[in-house]
Design a protein with these regions (language model features):
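Polyanion-binding surfaces on beta-sheet-dominated domains and ring/shell assemblies
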Residues: 1-270
């Protein structure tokens, strides 16, 4: 195949300029005043913006923004499963969790890596307990989560976004799924960690919880690093409390989505 010598091909691997960020990496996680690098307290969550109906072609969609963490989700289905799959009385959830190539410090590949596959499986595990899958025999619901910018806690943001997208799609659910994450540094827990906090060498471990607040059910639990038993139990309880604080925002976003849908139907009818 002839080579176009006039074309300048882009590099396969790129890295942004992070000189200011490198200085922040050398700072301690907690200042003398008891504040984190972004000015939050240990148990303080980042401000959250959540909105549904951002992808017109999808059955349901949502967008979440937690300062510099930005995630979008699109839901398609229920649709008939492939003939190769065995008949099941319950429907099936599938998820593709993907970091956009430009979302992280290092350029991500177009193919799913091991981390993205692990996150995809965890999202399915977290949402299966909330969706009434018995209502959709021999059908599947496809969830596509894309991280547009990753400044930490992208997995929890993806679960929250997917939960709202399922609700907007009209999928019957037992409850909305909220999610929260924290990192542990000795006896100190930092809720909703940023990317810099998550990669700090001072961190002992990380816990991510998916929680159904109304039913009081933990639908997903993911732990990395080394934590003592007492620390792990305390971390899970703290994440559950964080999920409960996020839940009203999730509920209000779904209410606003329903209002917009009803208003649109009334305008079409008139």
């Amino acid at each position: 195949m002839p080579v176009d010598n006039k074309r300048i091909p882009g590099p396969e691997i790129t890295q942004p300029v992070v000189l200011r960020e490198e200085k922040r990496l050398r700072k301690p996680l907690i200042s003398r005043e008891g504040l984190r690098q972004d000015g939050r307290k240990e148990d303080e969550l980042r401000p959250m913006f959540l909105r549904s109906g951002v992808v017109s072609q999808a059955r349901g969609s949502a967008y979440i923004e937690m300062r510099r963490t930005k995630v979008t989700c699109a839901v398609y289905g229920p649709r008939e499963s492939s003939r190769q799959q065995e008949f099941s009385q319950k429907g099936k959830l599938t998820c593709e969790f993907k970091f956009a190539p430009f979302s992280c410090w290092q350029r991500r590949q177009h193919m799913q890596d091991s981390e993205e596959k692990e996150f995809s499986s965890f999202v399915v595990q977290a949402l299966e307990s909330a969706v009434c899958l018995e209502k959709f025999p021999k059908a599947q619901i496809d969830i596509y989560i894309t991280v547009l910018e990753n400044d930490g806690n992208a997995l929890s943001a993806g679960i929250i976004c997917a939960s709202l997208a399922l609700g907007e799609a009209g999928i019957e659910m037992y409850d909305l799924v909220s999610s929260c994450s924290l990192i542990q540094k000795g006896s100190t827990s930092l809720m909703d960690p940023t990317f810099l906090e998550g990669v700090s060498p001072e961190v002992d471990g990380r816990v991510t919880v998916a929680f159904l607040p109304t039913l009081n059910i933990v639908s997903g639990l993911l732990q990395d690093g080394e934590l003592a038993h007492d620390q792990a139990v305390k971390a899970v309880k703290s994440c559950m409390e964080g999920c409960a604080r996020i839940y009203p925002v999730l509920q209000e976003s779904l209410v606003q989505a329903v209002k917009r849908t009803m208003k649109s139907k009334q305008q079409d009818a008139s």
